[in-house]
Amino acid sequence: MSTKDPNRLPHEKGFHISWDQIHRDSRALAWRLDGLGPDDGHWRAVVAITRGGMAPAMIVARELDIRTVDTISVKSYHSGGGKADQRREAEVLKSPDADIMGDGTGILIVDDLVDSGKTLELVRTLYPKAHFATVYAKPQGEPQVDTFITGVSQDTWIFFPWDMALQYVEPYRGTD
C-alpha cells in the first residue's frame, strides 16, 4: 500500500512526452476525428488554442487536409514556473476570425491538454457548436472535451517537448 508524501510537489508525478509521442498521439486524434465533421464528415476549420494546441492542431489539420487554420489565445495560468504556476480566471487574449467561427458549427478546436477545464469552458461559451478535441485529458476537465486520446490522473504533471530543454547532466559516478 502506498502513501502520499505530503512534501512532494504535484508536478513530481510527471508524464514526459517526446516529440515522437505527441506526433503519434496527434495523428491518433486526427484518425478519431476523421469523418465526424458535420459537412459530410468534413471540418470547415481547425482552431488551435495557443500555445499548447498549436503543434497538435497542425498535425490534425495536415492529416485531415484542413487548410483553414486559426488560433485563439487564452491565458488561464500565471507562468512563472514551479510553485508560481497558479490558476486564475481564463481570459481571451486573441480571438479567431469571426467570419470563420460563427457559433462554431463545423469548427474543430484543438488543445494539447484539458486540465481543470477552465480554458475549454470559456471557449465553449463563445463557440457552443464547435467540436473540442485534446490529445490528453485529466478527469476534472473531461466534461469540457468531446474527443481525446489519453486520460491521465489529475495529479500528474505533463511535460511537453516544447516546454523542455536538453541539457547536460552529470553522470552518477565519476566525471572523466
UniProtKB/Swiss-Prot annotation:
GO terms for molecular function: guanine phosphoribosyltransferase activity; hypoxanthine phosphoribosyltransferase activity; magnesium ion binding; xanthine phosphoribosyltransferase activity. The keyword Calcium does not apply. Guanine binds at residues 115, 158. Pathway: Purine metabolism; GMP biosynthesis via salvage pathway; GMP from guanine: step 1/1; Purine metabolism; XMP biosynthesis via salvage pathway; XMP from xanthine: step 1/1. InterPro entries: PRibTrfase_dom, PRTase-like, Xanthine_Guanine_PRibTrfase. GMP binds at residues 88, 115-119, 157-158. One of its GO terms (cellular component) is plasma membrane. Its EC number is 2.4.2.-, 2.4.2.22. PROSITE patterns: PUR_PYR_PR_TRANSFER. Xanthine binds at residues 115, 158. Its cofactor is Mg(2+). It catalyses: GMP + diphosphate = guanine + 5-phospho-alpha-D-ribose 1-diphosphate; XMP + diphosphate = xanthine + 5-phospho-alpha-D-ribose 1-diphosphate; IMP + diphosphate = hypoxanthine + 5-phospho-alpha-D-ribose 1-diphosphate. Signal peptide: none annotated. It is found in: Cell inner membrane. Mg(2+) binds at residue 112. Homotetramer. NCBIfam families: PRK09177.1. This is Xanthine-guanine phosphoribosyltransferase. It comes from Ruegeria sp. (strain TM1040).
